[in-house]
Curated annotation (Swiss-Prot):
GO terms for biological process: sucrose metabolic process. It is an enzyme of class 3 (hydrolase). InterPro entries: ConA-like_dom_sf, GH32_Enzymes, Glyco_hydro_32, Glyco_hydro_32_AS, Glyco_hydro_32_C, Glyco_hydro_32_N, Glyco_hydro_beta-prop_sf, Suc6P_hydrolase. Its main location: cytoplasm. PROSITE patterns: GLYCOSYL_HYDROL_F32 (PS00609). Keywords: Cytoplasm, Glycosidase, Hydrolase. Pathway: Glycan biosynthesis; sucrose metabolism. It comes from the Bacteria. This is Probable sucrose-6-phosphate hydrolase. The active site is at residue 110.
Length: 545
């Protein structure tokens, strides 16, 4: 018996949801029981999971089994691509951003595979197209020449194979001459208890558009680690390849696992890293690695650490640590600091541009928050703006990329005698100087606003979105600032977001801000000097191929 004959007995490829091969079994998850053949109905069947189970001993030619699995996966992928076609058309919504990346429909989360390859930028993101829930993720694919205007490409990866049928989870990309290589986590669930199985997988493309899955390249878990092992980042270091993985130890402590390889296909475990940080969260996600001004950094997403301020109640954090890579490949980590002090920033990825800049973007959301007003229109979440990173005089600096200046429309001249203005748009760039004790309100109308205030007594900056249409999540973020006479803010606003770069990029605060479509006013109390203001044009919609 071949795998193809099993598929036929189970109603054909159009009746197949997924194929799983745990232990010595072959599990076929189906859509309709009535389409099973009489022989298939004699096999063990789980009514709850709609799964038919065969023993692998029924396979006559074991040598062809692996190739047949990949071929079946490709057939399932072809069907999935047909099924998602209606969901690639963007739905209209008053909260749709003018110049940020958002999904046409469904749910967006982590950016993936952010890289410059063969003359253009590639950016992928986690996407579930059907509804606004976290489930069975795809890799959506965009390309750009300028990091501002993005073009939709065919979906790169679908959850179609035995090693990733419950989600092609996050990962990174490597550019090797003409070859674009995607490393990602394959997620699988087994049984009614939904036991998690994760492997680190590879897909390759010679044209940068169409990808062929190669299957797992790290098929086993690191020693002492739970199946919470994901998000591979591959780097070149000391003439060999290293893979960084976010993991959870069996004692539920987050750590970084590191592997090495000579050929990008065979990987050997080196070590778990991060003990010097102590008990630092129950899971680390989405590692990244880069060097700024001769200092190595690793980005981690520690879940469950202590929040930097009392108003931050979410367990999900993102930050950067200094890294010292030993010759063995093991990393010593120190000096964790948040990458963003706002509400909505997670799972960042970075790349190096041809002119040597380090550019980062992130998911402008958090894992547990999906009930946004846009969900009523069938989509949720967006990515942050692109930031340029530098390391100067011992400080990490983040600034908006210079390419954003191409979006500037006619400068807006605001009277120094007025304290309230109607910009007639939520898409704008604003440079202001605020004295302590002053308040700035944005996205304002009679129905609400978002407030930025400087508290003189505590020397803290607050962003307060409690007077907006927010449905879940924190409403206030705060951070301490160094002693100064004034605070310089460089603000980028879109239809439903604000990103505030503080004191020439010493800190950033990002926020999704939902207000009604007429909330286009700006006002302030106290000593606020508006230094420059531009309305921003729309970027190319990231849904158009």
């Amino acid at each position: 018996m071949s795998l193809f004959s099993i598929i036929k007995d189970c109603g054909g490829i159009h009746n197949i949801q997924r194929v799983l091969i745990p232990d010595s079994r072959i599990i076929i998850e189906i859509h309709e029981f009535e389409l099973l053949s009489a022989e298939a109905k004699q096999q063990a069947y789980n009514l709850t999971l709609k799964q038919v189970t065969y023993q692998q001993t029924v396979i006559e030619n074991k040598d062809e089994f692996g190739a047949q699995l990949l071929e079946i996966g490709q057939l399932i992928s072809d069907q999935q691509r047909q099924d998602i076609t209606p969901y690639t058309a963007p739905v209209e919504c008053e909260f749709r951003p003018d110049w940020h990346i958002s999904p046409p429909q469904g749910l967006l989360n982590d950016p993936n595979g952010f890289i410059y390859h063969q003359g253009q930028y590639h950016l992928f993101y986690q996407w579930y197209p059907y509804t606004c829930v976290h489930k069975d993720k795809y890799w959506a694919h965009l390309t750009s020449k300028d990091l501002v205007n993005w073009q939709w490409q065919p979906v790169a990866l679908t959850p179609s194979d035995w090693f990733d049928s419950y989600g092609v989870f996050s990962g990174h990309a490597i550019s090797q001459d003409d070859l674009l290589m995607l490393f990602y986590t394959g997620n699988v669930r087994i049984g009614e208890q939904r036991d998690r199985h994760t492997t680190q997988c590879l897909a390759t493309s010679t044209d940068g558009i169409h990808f062929t899955k190669q299957g797992p390249v790290v098929p086993e878990l690191p020693p002492g680690v739970t199946p919470h092992c994901r998000d591979p980042k591959v780097i070149r270091h000391n003439d060999r390849w290293l893979m960084l993985l976010g993991v959870q130890r069996e004692d539920e402590i987050g750590r970084l696992a590191i592997y090495h390889s000579e050929d990008l296909k065979t990987w050997t475990f080196i070590a778990l890293c991060g003990d010097e940080l102590g008990d630092f969260g129950y899971m680390w996600e989405c590692p990244d690695f880069f060097t700024l001004n001769q200092q190595d950094f690793i980005v981690i997403g520690p879940q469950g650490i202590r929040s930097p301020d009392k108003s931050h109640t979410a367990p999900h954090h993102n930050g950067i640590v200094k890294a010292q890579l030993e010759t063995s490949g093991k990393a010593l980590l120190s000096d964790f600091q948040p990458l963003d002090y706002g509400f909505d920033f997670y799972a960042p990825q970075s790349l190096e541009t041809p002119d040597g800049r380090r550019i980062m973007c992130a998911w402008m959301g958090l894992p547990d928050e999906i009930d946004h007003p846009s969900a009523d229109n069938g989509w949720v979440h967006q990515l942050t703006t692109m930031r340029e990173l530098s390391y100067d005089n011992g400080a990490l600096i983040q600034k908006p990329i210079k390419e954003l200046a191409t979006l500037r429309h006619t400068p807006i001249v605001l009277s120094k005698d007025e304290t309230s203005f109607d910009l007639h748009s939520k898409a704008f760039e604003l440079q202001v100087s605020m004295q302590w004790g002053s308040v700035l309100r944005l996205h304002q109308s009679e129905s609400g606003y978002c407030e930025i205030r400087l508290d003189s007594a505590s020397r803290r900056l607050y962003i307060d979105r409690s007077n907006t249409l927010i449905r879940e999540g924190d409403t206030v973020r705060e951070m301490s600032l160094a002693e100064s006479d004034s605070v310089q803010l460089h603000i980028f606003s879109d239809t439903s977001s604000l990103e505030v770069f503080i004191n020439e990029g010493e800190a950033v605060m990002s926020a999704r801000v939902f207000t009604d479509k007429n909330s286009t006013q700006l006002s302030f109390d106290g000593d606020v000097q508006i230094q420059a203001c531009w309305l921003l044009n729309k970027a190319s919609a990231p849904f158009i191929s």
